Design a protein with these regions (language model features):
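Membrane-integral, polyisoprenol-dependent glycosyltransferases
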Residues: 1-165
Length: 165
């Protein structure tokens, strides 16, 4: 049952998130800054001191840059100037957030509720936009949904040693 639903959710997400992912130019100035900082990280080989040109980018999550650099390195190491490889972590994170919402909603709702919640989240214009941008927002959403799922599972299963959460 879950396999069919998750497959359906992934297909729905891809139908919303793939159109334009490879062709639309940078949508936001912060997207360009994330991509440029990740590009500089790959060119310099310095994965600790994250910079946009000469300005440090210490206020943004470092994991975003690392995932973007890994994505570019795996998918198109010779095409550092194209924006689409930098967007793949956001695309995957948006899909993970939607799948996480499905499982989280299944804890509270009857079976069609989880799939409906996932479809509603996947079709929101904000998440569609974030899945198309090389920024940290979709990654942060995925981490929050996963954390919420872990918390509700801990609460529902009465795992006493995790009550400190």
């Amino acid at each position: 049952m879950h396999f069919k639903n998750v497959t359906l959710i992934i297909l729905i997400c891809l139908s919303f998130y793939l159109p334009g992912l490879f062709t639309i130019p940078a949508l936001d100035r912060d997207e360009a800054r994330f991509a440029q900082a990740s590009k500089q990280m790959l060119e310099s080989g310095n994965f600790v001191d994250i910079r946009f040109q000469e300005e440090p980018r210490y206020k943004k999550p470092a994991g975003t840059y690392w995932l973007q650099a890994a994505s570019v390195n795996l998918l198109s190491p010779s095409k550092l100037k194209e924006i689409w490889p930098y967007r793949i972590p956001s695309l995957l994170a948006a899909i993970i957030a939607v799948i996480g919402t499905y499982f989280l909603a299944n804890v509270f709702l009857r079976p069609p509720g989880g799939i409906i919640a996932a479809i509603i989240l996947s079709s929101t214009p904000l998440l569609i936009g974030e899945a198309h941008m090389a920024k940290s927002d979709a990654l942060l959403l995925a981490s929050v949904v996963i954390a919420q799922f872990g918390l509700i599972r801990t609460y529902r299963n009465h795992v006493s040693w995790l009550n400190w959460l």
